[in-house]
Amino acid sequence: MRVKGGPTTRRRRKKWLNQAEGTFGTRHASYKVAKQTVIKSAKYAFRDRKNKKREFRALWIQRLNGALRELGVTYSVFINLLKKQQITINRKMLSEIAIHDHEAFKKLVKEVTGK
């Protein structure tokens, strides 16, 4: 007698359909399309977890450069001076200081540049 898989097949397909929940149209209803959608979304998620790091670093650098140029220093010069003086503070913290505590940032820039 031939076994078609009944409950096993249903459970497997249901798993894919549940993962595709919240998508529009056939993407959440059709097994074949839902499976393709979930696989593609996983690829995007993997790729974008890497891109997120790049994008945030670029954002911090842009913020720093803007804040530094107001004080008459460029980003590249400032980072170079920090490294020469062996000051280890990451770009994220520097940009947060520049945004939220501008006076402290000014003092830090004066200290590093000697102006």
Swiss-Prot record:
Q: Which cysteines are joined by disulfide bonds?
A: none
- State the signal peptide span: none
**What is one Pfam family matched by this protein?**
Ribosomal_L20
Which UniProt keywords are given for this protein, alphabetically ordered? Ribonucleoprotein, Ribosomal protein, RNA-binding, rRNA-binding
Name one cellular component (GO) term.
Answer: ribonucleoprotein complex
Which Gene Ontology BP annotations are present? Answer: ribosomal large subunit assembly; translation
> From the Swiss-Prot or TrEMBL record, what is one GO molecular function term?
rRNA binding
The record's annotation in CDD domains points to: Ribosomal_L20 (cd07026)
Which PANTHER family does this entry report, sorted A to Z?
39S RIBOSOMAL PROTEIN L20
Instruction: List, alphabetically, the NCBIfam families matched.
Output: rplT_bact
The similarity comment for this entry is: Belongs to the bacterial ribosomal protein bL20 family.
Q: Give the protein's biological function.
A: Binds directly to 23S ribosomal RNA and is necessary for the in vitro assembly process of the 50S ribosomal subunit. It is not involved in the protein synthesizing functions of that subunit.
Quote the protein name from its UniProt record: Large ribosomal subunit protein bL20
Q: Quick one: which gene encodes this?
A: rplT
